[in-house]
From Swiss-Prot:
Binds 2 magnesium ions per subunit. NADP(+) binds at Y25, G26, S27, Q28, R48, S52, D82, E83, I84, Q85, G133. It comes from Staphylococcus aureus (strain MSSA476). PROSITE patterns: KARI_C, KARI_N. Its cofactor is Mg(2+). One of its GO terms (cellular component) is cytosol. Pfam families: KARI_C (PF01450), KARI_N (PF07991). Keywords: Amino-acid biosynthesis, Branched-chain amino acid biosynthesis, Magnesium, Metal-binding, NADP, Oxidoreductase. Residues 1-181 form the KARI N-terminal Rossmann domain. It is an enzyme of class 1 (oxidoreductase). This is Ketol-acid reductoisomerase (NADP(+)). InterPro entries: 6-PGluconate_DH-like_C_sf (IPR008927), KARI (IPR013023), KARI_C (IPR000506), KARI_N (IPR013116), KARI_prok (IPR014359), NAD(P)-bd_dom_sf (IPR036291). The keyword Amino-acid biosynthesis applies. Transmembrane segments: none annotated.
């Protein structure tokens, strides 16, 4: 049975009197740091010089190189991209850890797959908001929150659980509810969701639909509208009320087509392929491939990215979005 923790369930403020170093000031970093600061905690930022360093200064934080921030802190929350956490930990965090420090993460990748192996005398915990940083911050300011996960990997001090829950409350997460998990469960489910459904699955489904229509002689512009542009309408309905809300909101024609044609596209073979993806995540094949490619300068990653950038659906989409000024441009600068 899933247990959800709320504000009233956090009986002890285990962060009281402790200094918190937030390492990184990107999407999650700025939200965690500002929420904690607004709740009265002593927060410093650890980051390398650059735009984020300057932004943290502008936002009123004491900002230090990572090693200096860690030296001062009792709790260290690492909010850096997965691929750079290992080097930053080895060179700047690990040498400055002290007994009974608490080392925290918002995603379990590097702990679960052994890239980062903390000493046995420090606490290791996870607090993972289920939403992007700007939403974590905005909902906090509005008086609500984004639901989050928390988990304990090591409890050297005997207080890791209290510290993790206090941290979750500090960023506002217990207003909405915090679900207990493990580093293993959070990591494997997160990667599976990204690869099989949210990113890999959806993007390939859209591409295949686009190609099917274009190859059948339909105009690429119409294909784009039908399989990509209108996706937002469906996702918004699903986000607000699940698949039942989608089916309630669409036409009877669309709903009937959902029932009779959906299983023809997503066949039992697709589920078997999903199981294979999950197996590659569980046994470390995916993480090893990602880690090795990172060591080799992301040659495979950048090659795959460039191939996808050149797909016809991307070219058509860029042209059509010029016709829609009501869409706030989020195009990536090259």
């Amino acid at each position: 049975m899933t247990t959800v923790y709320y504000d009233q369930d956090v009986k002890t403020d285990a962060l009281q009197g402790k200094k918190i170093a937030v390492v990184g000031y990107g999407s999650q970093g700025h939200a965690h740091a500002q929420n904690l600061k607004d709740n009265g905690y002593d927060v410093v930022i650890g980051i390398r010089p650059g735009r984020s360093f300057d932004k943290a200064k502008e936002d009123g934080f004491d900002v230090f190189p990572v090693a200096e921030a860690v030296k001062q802190a009792d709790v260290i929350m690492v909010l850096l991209p997965d691929e750079i956490q290992g080097d930053v930990y080895k060179n700047e965090i690990e040498p400055n850890l002290e007994k009974h420090n608490a080392l925290a993460f918002a995603h379990g990748f590097n702990i679960h797959f052994g890239v980062i192996q903390p000493p046995a005398d420090v606490d290791v915990f996870l607090v993972a908001p289920k939403g992007p940083g700007h939403l974590v911050r905005r909902t906090f300011v509005e008086g609500s929150a984004v639901p989050s996960l928390f988990g304990i990997q090591q409890d050297a001090s005997g207080q890791a659980r209290n510290i993790a829950l206090s941290y979750a409350k500090g960023i506002g997460a217990t207003r909405a509810g915090v679900i207990e998990t493990t580093f293993k469960e959070e990591t494997e489910t997160d990667l599976f969701g990204e690869q099989a459904v949210l990113c890999g699955g959806v993007s390939k489904l859209i591409q295949s639909g686009f190609e099917t229509l274009v190859e059948a002689g339909y105009q690429p512009e119409l294909a784009y509208f039908e399989v990509l542009h209108e996706m937002k309408l469906i996702v918004d309905l699903m986000y607000e009320g699940g698949t039942e809300n989608v089916r309630y909101s669409i036409s009877n024609t669309a709903e009937f087509g959902d029932y009779v044609s959906g299983p023809r596209v997503i066949t039992p073979d697709v589920k078997e392929n999903m199981k294979a993806v999950l197996t590659d995540i569980q046994n470390g094949n995916f993480s090893n491939r990602f880690i090795e490619d990172n060591k080799n300068g992301f040659k495979e990653f950048y090659k795959l990215r460039e191939e996808q950038h050149g797909h016809q659906i991307e070219k058509v989409g860029r042209e059509l979005r010029e016709m829609m000024p009501f869409i706030k441009s989020k195009s990536i600068e090259k």
